[in-house]
Amino acid sequence: MAASRPLSRFWEWGKNIVCVGRNYADHVREMRSAVLSEPVLFLKPSTAYAPEGSPILMPAYTRNLHHELELGVVMGRRCRAVPEAAAMDYVGGYALCLDMTARDVQDECKKKGLPWTLAKSFTASCPVSAFVPKEKIPDPHKLKLWLKVNGELRQEGETSSMIFSIPYIISYVSKIITLEEGDIILTGTPKGVGPVKENDEIEAGIHGLVSMRFKVEKPEY
C-alpha cells in the first residue's frame, strides 16, 4: 500500500518525472529561445532516477552532455485538475535535481521537429538529492541553487526568478496528467548550463538545506 512507502525514498517507487522547460528567463535567453505563455512539458521514465551514490551515465550517442540544475517538487498525494490556490496542499516535499541533457541530440531533435526523448530521458538522466520535507521550506520561491563542476561554480540562481510559479505549474500539469504520490515535477533551470565529460565531478546544492555529489561515467555496455 502507498502508506507503507516512505516519501523520503520517492525515487524507488514514484511513477512520473514531469519536467518543465523554459521557466527561467535568463536560461531562455542563453538558449536563444522564446518565453512562452504556457509551460513547456516533457517526461522522463522512472529509470532516469540516479540517487546520490550512483553515477551519472553518459550515453554513447552524445558528445555534448549538459547539466541543468533544478528544484524538484515531490507530490505528497494524488491530485487531478487541482486549482492553483490549493496546489501547495498536495506537495509532500522537495529535492534538488539535475536534468542531464544530450545537447547535441536535442539540437538535432529541434531541427527535425522531433520530441526530446533521446536527449532527456536516458538512464540516470535525473540525479536527485536526499528528500527535503515540505516543513523545512516555508516558501520554495525563496531558495538559492548552485552547481559546481570539478570545484568550479557553473550555475547559480534563485527560485524567485521562475516565470511560472510552483502552484501554477502543479495546477497546469494536473489538468493534463493525474499526479500520484511520489511523483516529482522538475521546475526548470536557471542560466549557466554547460558540458560535462567522463570522470567530471558535479556538486550541487540548495543553500543552507541540502547538497549532493555525482561522478560522470560511461556505461559498460
Curated annotation (Swiss-Prot):
GO cellular component term of the entry, any: mitochondrion
Where on the chain is N6-succinyllysine found, per UniProt?
112
Example GO molecular function term? acylpyruvate hydrolase activity
Show the Pfam families listed in the entry: FAA_hydrolase
Q: Which residues carry this modification: N6-acetyllysine?
A: 110
Q: What is its main location?
A: mitochondrion
Q: Does the keyword Membrane apply?
A: no
Q: Which InterPro entries match?
A: Fumarylacetoacetase-like_C, Fumarylacetoacetase_C_sf
> What are the alphabetically sorted keywords of the record?
Acetylation, Cytoplasm, Hydrolase, Isomerase, Lyase, Magnesium, Manganese, Metal-binding, Mitochondrion, Phosphoprotein, Transit peptide
Q: Which cofactor does it need?
A: Mg(2+); Mn(2+)
- Domain of life of the organism encoding this protein: Eukaryota
GO BP annotations, alphabetical order: oxaloacetate metabolic process
- Any idea where this protein resides? Mitochondrion; Cytoplasm, Cytosol
Describe regulators of its activity: Oxaloacetate decarboxylation is competitively inhibited by oxalate.
Question: Which Enzyme Commission number(s) are on file for it?
Answer: 5.3.2.2, 3.7.1.5, 4.1.1.112
Detail which positions bind Mg(2+): 68, 70, 99
Q: Which reaction does it catalyse?
A: oxaloacetate = enol-oxaloacetate; oxaloacetate + H(+) = pyruvate + CO2; a 3-acylpyruvate + H2O = a carboxylate + pyruvate + H(+); acetylpyruvate + H2O = acetate + pyruvate + H(+)
The entry's function note states: Tautomerase that converts enol-oxaloacetate, a strong inhibitor of succinate dehydrogenase, to the physiological keto form of oxaloacetate. It is thereby required to maximize aerobic respiration efficiency by preventing succinate dehydrogenase inhibition. Also acts as a weak oxaloacetate decarboxylase (ODx), catalyzing the decarboxylation of oxaloacetate (OAA) to pyruvate and CO(2), and as such is likely a regulatory enzyme in the TCA cycle. Also displays acylpyruvase activity, being able to hydrolyze acetylpyruvate and fumarylpyruvate in vitro.
Q: Summarize subunit and interaction data from the UniProt record for this chain.
A: Homodimer.
Protein's name in the database: Oxaloacetate tautomerase FAHD1, mitochondrial
Q: Which gene encodes it?
A: FAHD1
